[in-house]
């Protein structure tokens, strides 16, 4: 049996994290997604990983047999330049993706569980995310206790209040 390892994201992992950002943004795989390089240059996506290592940035990478298969990361945004799942400057926004060929094996749940534990240890009071209403990952977030906080056309900002285990 191949083992799953989850380790902190390093600067060397950023190309893979960017690829996972692309997977998170264009999860439908309908063939009409823009090329990855062009998509990741768009300011609304670039803010999720550009200048990685700022205060409040934290991320985890999942590997199977030494190969990266998924990532989860959080970032706090200022009010004047924030992401899709923004709630406030104190609430980190979570991003997560698993490589398409590795979805459905529980890797996303392992990553999410590990990140929520890390956030609790770090004293975060809550965490947010944005998910499209028809994204199957929404059920994962609901299982972990995320609830709708706001809605826009086709997407929901979800929020989880973190309490000590």
Question: What does each model-identified segment do?
Answer:
Residues 1-15, 19, 23-24, 163-165:
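Conserved N-terminal entry element of GNAT/NAT acetyltransferase domains
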Residues 63, 68-95:
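Conserved acyl-donor/pantetheine-binding loop and adjacent beta-alpha core of acyl/acetyltransferases
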Residues 93-104, 131:
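A short, internal acetyl-CoA/4′-phosphopantetheine-binding micro-motif in the GNAT/acyltransferase core
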Residues 104-117, 121, 142-143:
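Conserved acetyl-CoA-binding loop-helix of GNAT-fold acetyltransferases
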Residues 108, 112, 134-137, 153-160:
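Short glycine/proline-centered loop/turn elements that form peptide/ligand docking sites
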Residues 119-132:
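Conserved GNAT acetyl-CoA-binding A-motif
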Residues 142-152:
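Conserved acetyl-CoA-binding loop of GNAT-fold acetyltransferases
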